[in-house]
Each structure stands twice: as C-alpha cells, then as structure tokens.
Curated annotation (Swiss-Prot):
InterPro entries (UniProt xref): Alpha/beta_knot_MTases, tRNA_m1G_MeTrfase_C_sf, tRNA_m1G_MeTrfase_TrmD, tRNA_m1G_MTases_N, tRNA_MeTrfase_TRMD/TRM10
A Gene Ontology biological process term: tRNA N1-guanine methylation
Gene that encodes it: trmD
GO molecular function: tRNA (guanine(37)-N1)-methyltransferase activity
Gene3D superfamilies xrefs: 3.40.1280.10, tRNA(m1g37)methyltransferase, domain 2
EC number annotated for this UniProt entry: 2.1.1.228
Catalyses which reaction(s): guanosine(37) in tRNA + S-adenosyl-L-methionine = N(1)-methylguanosine(37) in tRNA + S-adenosyl-L-homocysteine + H(+)
Protein name: tRNA (guanine-N(1)-)-methyltransferase
Organism, scientific name: Serratia proteamaculans (strain 568)
Record's subunit section: Homodimer.
Keywords attached to this entry: Cytoplasm, Methyltransferase, S-adenosyl-L-methionine, Transferase, tRNA processing
C-alpha cells in the first residue's frame, strides 16, 4: 500500500514509519509512506504557506499554490488511481466500516490542514473525500492522518502476526471486544474466569461472544441498535443482562 502525506510537519510521521506495527510494515515493504511539505513549493525567501482569509476573521488559511503543487507532486509519485483525502472536521466520521473501505485502496494521499483550514477551491479541485476522526478540534490534520494510517495498515495482509487479530478487534463485527487475561492466574484475589482455563474452545468462544455483547450493551448501547443479532447472540445477550442484574442486586443488598 502507498500512502502519500501532504503536511507542513512531515517529521511527525516518523511515529508511523519508525515504530510499532506500521514501522514493521514499512520495514518489510508492505507499506510505503512518503511526505511532501507545501513549504518546499514556495518561491519567496520566507517560504510563506499561509495568508489572510477574504472577508476577514481570525486566523490564517493555507495558501492555494504551495498546497496544490505539493498535492500534484504526491499524485505524480503515486501514479494513477490514488484517492486524495482531506482530514477535516466536516468529513465523514471514521469508523471500522470506513476503515475497511479505505483499506481496499492500494494508493491514497492524505492532506493535512493547518491554521484555520484550506481554501475551499483546493477542496473542490483536488480532494476526492473528506474524513474526520471525531467531533472535536485539533491543531492540524497530522494526528487524524496517523490515526487513519494505523487503522488501515492493520488490514494489509502480512502486517499483523495473526490476521485474526484484526478480525477480532473491537468494532470488527460491530461489537466491543471481550475482556482478555494473561498470567498470573490470580492477581490480588482476582481470578481468571475458569472457562478460559478449561480448554473447551466452544465454551470459550461462547463466553467471549457473551462478554462482547454485554460490554457493548453496557458501554455503547447505540451500537446494538444497528445490528441484527443472530438467535445465539440474542440468547447470550439476554443471559448477560440477567447475570448483570443479579450482580447489581447482590451489590446493592450488601451496601
């Protein structure tokens, strides 16, 4: 997969190229990340990349010419078919479904805004899609771009040690992940659930699914509203809800 980055701070992306899962993907040739700075496409001695907005108002906008030339350079390096994405609060909110869609693109270019944003005409002429990572304000598009790269890279074949890791992540099937445990078996009186030690893979799968459903119901109930539960899932969720209610009653009775 090729990912081009247009950013005033390309050095920030060493966090992606040098470390962790994405760093290994780059090292192993599974992911190529290249950066272009609009500042390298300026022609004045101050290397100016921002200007005042027409109509007044606070802040500055990224200038059209350096930004467009940086995007064009990234497009030329990517070749035909590269999707150009602007990280923007006005964009479609990134979720696991969106990540899967983006992961199907072998080439993409991520444009990171700064200041108060970019000239609307750049969006109209150069941008294919706008994406957001949430309804809050950041100083620029670099962190959203890194979030997108990290999430998409997990779907590149060979990046993860076990492809099932991506398939079993939270949100992969519309649910939150189940609890996980490792050694020691007992920690300060808290024991690993016996079913996980049983070796009964069918029961372990059932327990994990029930916990995943229950955790989603407790923490993100709106996710369940968009899911058509299977008969097994409906039964397991009802079991979890009954068990949770019993625990709550026992707790309140002991207070």
């Amino acid at each position: 997969m090729f990912i081009g980055i247009v950013s005033l701070f390309p050095e920030m992306f060493r966090a992606i190229t040098d470390y962790g899962v994405t760093g290994r993907a780059v090292k192993n040739g599974l992911l190529s990340v290249q950066c272009w700075s609009p500042r390298d496409f300026t022609y004045d001695r101050h290397r100016t990349v921002d200007d005042r907005p027409y109509g007044g108002g606070p802040g500055m906008l990224m200038m059209v010419q350096p930004l467009r030339e940086a995007i064009h350079a990234a497009k030329a390096a990517a070749g035909e078919g590269a999707k150009v994405i602007y990280l923007s609060p006005q964009g479609r909110k990134l979720d696991q479904t969106g990540v899967c869609e983006l992961a199907a693109n072998p080439k993409m270019i991520l444009v990171c805004g700064r200041y108060e944003g970019v000239d609307e005409r750049v969006i109209q002429t150069e941008i294919d899609e706008e994406w957001s990572i949430g309804d809050y304000v950041l100083s620029g598009g670099e962190l959203p771009a890194m979030t997108l790269i990290d999430s998409v890279a997990r779907f590149i074949p060979g990046v993860l040690g076990h492809q099932a890791s991506a398939e079993e992540d939270s949100f992969a099937d519309g649910l939150l992940d189940c609890p996980h445990y490792t050694r020691p078996e007992v920690l300060e009186g808290m024991e690993v659930p016996p079913v996980l030690l049983s070796g009964n893979h069918a029961e372990i799968r059932r327990w994990r699914l029930k916990q995943s459903l229950g955790r989603t119901w407790l923490r993100r109930p709106e996710l369940l509203e968009s899911l058509a539960l299977t008969d097994e899932q409906a039964v397991l969720l009802a079991e979890f809800q009954r068990e949770h209610q019993t625990k709550q009653q026992d707790y309140e009775g002991n207070v």
